[in-house]
Amino acid sequence: MNEFKPLLGKVATGASLTRDEAAYVFDKMMSGEATPSQMGALLMGLRVRGETVEEIAGAVSVMRSKMLSVEAPSEAVDVVGTGGDASGSYNISTCASFIVAGAGVPVAKHGNRALSSKSGAADVLAALGVRIDLDPAGISRCIAEAGIGFMFAPSHHPAMKHVGPTRVEMGTRTIFNLLGPLSNPAGVTRQMVGVFAKSWIVPLAEVLRTLGSQKAFVVHGSDGLDEITISGGTDIAVLDEGRIHTFTIMPEDVGLKRHPAEDLKGGDAVHNAKALRTVLDGAEGAYRDVSLFNAAAALVVAGRAKDLKEGVEMARVSLDTGSARARLEHLVAVSEKLAPEAAQ
C-alpha cells in the first residue's frame, strides 16, 4: 500500500494515472487494502477531473480478474446500461434481452438490483419468477437450455464488498458505475452498453476496444436515457473490428413511431414485470417499440442483422411468433429447476 499515497497525490494534482497505475490502486481497493478515506478521496478525485480511458481500462482489468466467471457461447451478447440516468424508465434492456434470445442469439445478461430507479434488472426478473441466485454452472445451463441467463452482479464480483460502503457513503456517481457494464462475467465480446451521458459514448467504446471487444454499440438517448430512445434521437458509438465511428438515429429511420419520454416511465418491480409480460404477449405501444429498437441494436452487434432496420424486423418476428415470450417461460422453468434448494 506504500504506492497508494503517491498515486493519490498524483490524482490530487489533476494528473492522470497510467493503465498500470490505475490497476494498482483498484487492486488495493478491491483487495481491502485501502482505507475508506483513501478510496473516497481517489474516487472523488477521478470523478471531479474526469476518468480517462486508460484509468477505466486498468480498473476494469482488475475487476474482471477478480470476478466469478460463467461459461457462455462465444457469440453471446449482453444488453446493459450504466444506470444513473434518473429516468425511472421501464426495464427496457431486460425486455430487449428476451427478444434477442427469441431471435436465436444467446444472451448473457449482467445486472443488479435498482440503484437509482425503482426496478433494476434483478428486481424485475425476480418478480417475473426467474431465480437470480444460481451458481455459475446453473447460469451456463440457463444460457444453453433457455437461450438466456442472468448473472447477478454482487454474486460475481465479491471483491466489490470492499468498496460498497464507501460508495454508499459518497452517494454520488463514481467510476464504478462505468465498470459494472464493462465487466460481464461471461466475458462477452459483443455488447450494447447504454450510458448516462453523451460524453461517455466514445470513451467507453475506446475502453471496450482496448479490452478486446469485437463489436459494440455504446448509446445515449437525447432524453437522457441510457438506452436507445424513441422520444427523439439516440447518439451511438459503434466499435467494429477495432474501428470506432458515431452516428445519430431516430425512431422514424427504422420504421418506428415516436413516443413521448413520459410513456417510457416505469414503476416498481411488480409494475414493470407486468408491463414486460404485456410486451411479450404482443401489446402495442411505447414499451414495445423501445424494446424492439434496443433489441435491434443487439441483433446488429451479434452479427445477425445487417442494420438497425433489419434488426427491428427480426425483433418483431421474435415477439409476434411468441418466441421471446417462450424464452422467458423457459428461463423461469430452468432457473427454478436449478435453484439451490432444488438441488438438495
From Swiss-Prot:
Record's cofactor remark: Binds 2 magnesium ions per monomer.
Annotated residues for binding of Mg(2+) 1: S93, E227
Example GO BP: L-tryptophan biosynthetic process
Keywords: Amino-acid biosynthesis, Aromatic amino acid biosynthesis, Glycosyltransferase, Magnesium, Metal-binding, Transferase, Tryptophan biosynthesis
A Pfam family of this chain: Glycos_transf_3
A cellular component term, taken from the record's GO annotations: cytosol
InterPro entries for this protein: Anthranilate_Pribosyl_Tfrase, Glycosyl_Trfase_fam3, Glycosyl_Trfase_fam3_N_dom, Glycosyl_Trfase_fam3_N_dom_sf, Nuc_phospho_transferase
Cofactor(s) in the UniProt record: Mg(2+)
Residues the entry annotates as binding Mg(2+) 2: D226, E227
Protein name: Anthranilate phosphoribosyltransferase
Coiled coil location: none
Binding site for 5-phospho-alpha-D-ribose 1-diphosphate: 81, 84-85, 89, 91-94, 109-117, 121
Entry GO MF terms: anthranilate phosphoribosyltransferase activity; magnesium ion binding
Catalytic activity, EC: 2.4.2.18
Pathway: Amino-acid biosynthesis; L-tryptophan biosynthesis; L-tryptophan from chorismate: step 2/5
List of residues binding anthranilate 1: G81, N112
Binding site for anthranilate 2: R167
Assigned protein family: Belongs to the anthranilate phosphoribosyltransferase family.
Task performed by this protein: Catalyzes the transfer of the phosphoribosyl group of 5-phosphorylribose-1-pyrophosphate (PRPP) to anthranilate to yield N-(5'-phosphoribosyl)-anthranilate (PRA).
Subunit structure, as described in the record: Homodimer.
